[in-house]
Swiss-Prot record:
The modification N-methylphenylalanine is found at F7. Component of the type II secretion system required for the energy-dependent secretion of extracellular factors such as proteases and toxins from the periplasm. Part of the pseudopilus tip complex that is critical for the recognition and binding of secretion substrates. Cleaved by prepilin peptidase. Methylated by prepilin peptidase at the amino group of the N-terminal phenylalanine once the leader sequence is cleaved by prepilin peptidase. GO terms for cellular component: plasma membrane; type II protein secretion system complex. This is Type II secretion system protein I. Keywords: Cell inner membrane, Cell membrane, Membrane, Methylation, Protein transport, Transmembrane, Transmembrane helix, Transport. The keyword Phosphoprotein does not apply.
């Protein structure tokens, strides 16, 4: 009897199972990378909005009062909130700036800073 050349069905199925396992791992890795990039992008733009609001306070520290508003950046609307914080002495004024992606949502970034009184 002549021997036939080629792969058996079992060999093909084993190879396919190995390939499928590897492909699933690659897909999960790429998906996680995309999620991380989106998260870092959101944090970066929120930090830029915080920087803008902190600069406004630094330019005019006498007008430090609780307020909130919105700002356009990177084609999105960011909602910020400025909150004065009491300090132990009168040498410094403290304030928090929080930025969220939706009004009333949990802030993406919150930063505390100080200005001279």
């Amino acid at each position: 009897m002549k021997s036939k050349r080629g792969f058996t069905l079992l060999e093909v199925l084993v190879a396919l199972a190995i390939f499928a396992t590897a492909a699933i791992s690659v897909i999960r890795s790429v998906s996680q990378h995309i999620n991380t990039v989106n998260y870092l992008e959101e944090k970066m733009f929120a930090a830029m909005v915080v920087d803008n609001q902190m600069a406004q306070v630094m330019l005019n520290p006498q007008s430090l009062a609780a307020r909130e508003g919105s700002e356009q950046m990177a084609g999105r609307t960011w909602y910020w909130k400025l909150s004065p914080v009491k300090t132990a002495d009168n040498l410094l004024k403290a304030f928090d700036v929080s930025v969220a992606t939706e009004k009333g949502a949990t802030p993406v970034v919150t930063v505390r800073s100080y200005v001279a009184n």
